[in-house]
């Protein structure tokens, strides 16, 4: 049985190398990632069961450990590898964003923030710190809360701005509900942070709310916040 499983795995790798990665189905890609099965299941069978259980690649990438381990034959090692692969992709996206001489590509910025934040199950508050030429210094996730809210304090943000010698920043947070509209609480904390940054001569460029399929720019939709 193990010989057959190994041959199946080699066939998938040969298909990838011969025809390109785009020739593989989602299940086949997962099978290559899983790499090896066990005495009862091949890597392809494990990939099929995982996809059937969780639905699609996005759900698999964002699954918690217990959901992942519910498939017999998959454990902590494969889960850790999956999370590492996911983070590698995130960091690659950040490198692409940093290549901008100045952060002027709004859609690219939105896409990066959306990919980073939209799948979190709890509300997470992040910031892009920029220099005086609007070049990226750092991306950091600063606060995390419950499914409905994250408690955000201006002081740690200002302290981080000073530590990084940042001149400007873009804030972003997700709504786990999937809705991207800003709440009154979102508008209020935006004003508080903007005013706190003014005291240290740093500029808040925008606050982006990330929904499931859309993003909402508080500054674009509420011009009075910019003043």
Curated annotation (Swiss-Prot):
Motif annotated as JAMM motif, chain positions: 173-186
GO biological process, one term: proteolysis
Keyword tags: Hydrolase, Metal-binding, Metalloprotease, Protease, Zinc
Gene Ontology molecular function, alphabetical: metal ion binding; metallopeptidase activity
Ligand binding (Zn(2+)): 173, 175, 186
Record keyword Metal-binding present: yes
Superkingdom assignment: Bacteria
SUPFAM superfamilies in the cross-refs: RuvA domain 2-like (SSF47781)
InterPro entries recorded: MPN, RadC_JAB, RuvA_2-like, UPF0758, UPF0758_CS, UPF0758_N
Residues annotated as domain MPN: 102-225
PROSITE patterns membership: MPN, UPF0758
Family matches, as NCBIfam families: PRK00024.1, radc
Name of the protein: UPF0758 protein lpp2553
Natural source organism: Legionella pneumophila (strain Paris)
Organism ancestry: Bacteria, Pseudomonadati, Pseudomonadota, Gammaproteobacteria, Legionellales
């Amino acid at each position: 049985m193990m010989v057959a499983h190994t041959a199946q795995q080699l066939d998938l790798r040969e298909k990838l190398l011969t025809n390109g990665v785009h020739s593989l189905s989602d299940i086949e890609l997962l099978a290559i990632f899983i790499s090896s099965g066990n005495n009862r299941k091949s890597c392809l069978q494990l990939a099929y069961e995982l996809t059937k259980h969780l639905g699609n690649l996005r759900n698999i990438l964002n699954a918690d450990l217990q959901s992942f381990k519910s498939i017999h034959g998959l454990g902590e090692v494969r889960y850790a590898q999956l999370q590492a692969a996911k983070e590698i992709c995130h960091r690659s996206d950040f490198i692409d964003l940093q290549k901008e001489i100045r952060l002027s590509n709004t859609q690219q910025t939105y896409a990066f923030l959306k990919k980073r934040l939209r799948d979190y199950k709890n509300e997470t508050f992040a910031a892009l710190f920029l220099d005086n030429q609007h070049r990226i210094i750092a991306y950091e996730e600063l606060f995390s809360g419950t499914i409905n809210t994250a408690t955000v304090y201006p002081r740690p943000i200002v302290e981080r701005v000073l530590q990084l010698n940042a001149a400007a920043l873009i804030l972003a947070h997700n709504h786990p509900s999937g809705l991207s509209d800003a709440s009154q609480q979102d508008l209020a904390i935006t004003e508080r942070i903007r005013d706190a940054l003014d005291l240290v001569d740093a500029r808040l460029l925008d606050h982006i709310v990330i929904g499931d399929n859309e993003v909402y720019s508080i500054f674009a939709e509420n011009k009075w916040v910019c003043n």
